[in-house]
Amino acid sequence: MSNKEEHVDETSASGVKEVSSIAARHDNGYAPSLITSTSGMDSFQSHALLNDPTLIEDYSDIINNRPTSGSKLTLGNEDSESMGGSVVVTPTSNKSSPFNSKLNILSNAAEKGHDVLRNRDDDKELEEENVEKHMHSNSKRDQRHYKENSSELPDSYDYSDSEFEDNLERRLQEIETDSVDSADKDEVHFSVNNTMNPDVDDFSDGLKYAISEDEDEEENYSDDDDFDRKFQDSGFQGEKDDLEEENDDYQPLSPPRELDPDKLYALYAFNGHDSSHCQLGQDEPCILLNDQDAYWWLVKRITDGKIGFAPAEILETFPERLARLNCWKNENMSSQSVASSDSKDDSISSGNKNQSDAESIIPTPALNGYGKGNKSVSFNDVVGYADRFIDDAIEDTSLDSNDDGGEGNGQSYDDDVDNDKETKVTHRDEYTEAKLNFGKFQDDDTSDVVSDVSFSTSLNTPLNVKKVRRQDNKNESEPKTSSSKDREDDYNANRYVGQEKSEPVDSDYDTDLKKVFEAPRMPFANGMAKSDSQNSLSTIGEFSPSSSEWTNESPSTPIVEESSSIPSSRAIKDISQYIHAKSKIEETTNVENTEGQIQASLGSSGGMANQTDAEQPKEELEKHHSTPEEEKQSTLSLHSSSEEDFYMDEQRAVSSASINSSLSGSRALSNTNMSDPASKPNSLVQHLYAPVFDRMDVLMKQLDEIIRK
């Protein structure tokens, strides 16, 4: 301990040489044994190495700035304060890596030892072996000494011998210089170094790794890139294969080949693992049994009749299947049209360039452009159509004509002969016009919509409306009434539906009539109770006076005296559509008058009635309607002359006396009110209702006679 204090006091005065000699007399003797007995070098070389200013550093600045006696450093072992020339003191921490200190040693010693290493003798290898042996023995003592110092001091220091550092530096420099000179020598020295002690090998390997760390990083960059590229290529290849397999699974489905409303079809194959599942193949049909659950439907497989559950999302219903078929057809047709247009454009462009060559090489197809023209729609009863007949040879031109049986108004033949080196194609077009006959219904505008209230639509006659009316030529020669020409056409259009079936009908006149508005006949209307409502089933489609509630054929309703008029709109429409011509009405009235006279001759009480019946019906109706017209003027405003003329007496009498009294009163009132134009009845109404009232009078007279008897 006294030697160390003397060394510290005399360091600044005696120099580096005296410090090294004092350190050589240290009790432990680590450095002297390393220098004198183990180095194997002569004294000259050892003194040259120790006194070389490039290898020995001056620690005067450290000695001057050493800590005071009261600092924490002096509290521990005083050996830590000794600064020998051959000892390098480096403070370390528990977290410091040994490679960092070794890198610092290499960086300082690499530049200073080039000249010394180049002047060495040939016995360098032997010396290195001796040094390695002593290093192995001394390393154990260093470790033991380090443990003792670390136990005594709280802050331990790393001690490294200068001779050991020099030997290590020489070895590393030899490796570097030999690697620069030739790679072979580098391999030899590296193999010799591998024969060293395992501890030294580990240490040298760590230093070697620290030196070549930067170079390895640069090389690793390229190696890592190559490895990553290979890994990515292999990984992406696998992912690519997986994606291709998934794309194969979700390829667009083929168009449906079977359509059945009662079946379901599997869009994709279903392989259920549960026993309750029904396994289905792609496009396999099945029958739906229960669809109450939104996710699993109970189905029955058609192939073997197995019943089980299948996911509803893979089952395709009939509307969905039909929609998919339509989509496929639309896409297919659009793609074909685009391809055909492109090919047509290409052929046209090529034909414009080499027209002569194209005509000789490319044959014109026989049906080129057939069916691509504009399609027309005809709304009349004459249909024109064309048939194209293709012959294999020019001689075979005789083909059957139209098999439809229609009237051929005109036929035109268009023969096109396509000359080719091998084949000759001939075709001809036959145009035909035919008139369509659909029985008594000559209009094809019937609606296919079926009403919800109809129960048996097959037996009902469809409602047929003619949009164009043809004017009758026979009625033009007959005398016209005071009404307009349009109203006269309406007279000739229909017959009065209230007449009996036994009434004689003129055949010539019947052929000239044309049905304009015909209501369907219900097959179950005979057994149905009549209803007063206009919206009931019994009155749907009946546009005739028989549907009116104010005639004898309507159901009996309580007679109300307050109602002095009938519904105007419906009555006017119904009556205006079923009015007779003047000639027919006069003919029927004459027949009824003769029948009334024959029946009236049976009783004496009906004599006066027979005289009134013999009079003209025009005068009778004027007298009969004069009184109601005066009552109507007091209660209602004058809407129109036709509406006032349709007034009917609601209080129908039950005896002939009441009828005769009303007729007699009407005669008296008609004479006073003939000058009033509003009270004058219309001639059309007289012709319409005169036969009805006459027959009613005759019937009432017969009833009176029966009662009297």
From Swiss-Prot:
Biased composition (Acidic residues): 212-226, 396-406
Keywords (A to Z) from UniProt: Acetylation, Cell cycle, Cell division, Phosphoprotein, SH3 domain
Skewed-composition ranges (Basic and acidic residues): 111-123, 131-150, 470-504, 615-633
GO CC entries: cell tip; cellular bud neck; cellular bud tip; cytoplasm; incipient cellular bud site; Kelch-containing formin regulatory complex; microtubule cytoskeleton; nucleus
Record keyword Ribonucleoprotein present: no
Biased composition (Polar residues): 62-74, 89-107, 531-552, 600-614
GO MF term list: protein phosphatase regulator activity
Feature: compositional bias, Low complexity: 553-569, 655-671
Function of the molecule: Important for bud site selection. Seems to be a regulatory subunit of the BUD14-GLC7 type-I phosphatase complex. The BUD14-GLC7 complex is necessary to regulate microtubule dynamics at the cortex and may function as a specific activator of the dynein complex.
Subunit description: Interacts with GLC7.
Other observations noted: Present with 538 molecules/cell in log phase SD medium.
UniProt xrefs under PANTHER family: BUD SITE SELECTION PROTEIN 14
Protein name: Bud site selection protein 14
Species whose genome carries this gene: Saccharomyces cerevisiae (strain ATCC 204508 / S288c)
Recorded name of the encoding gene: BUD14
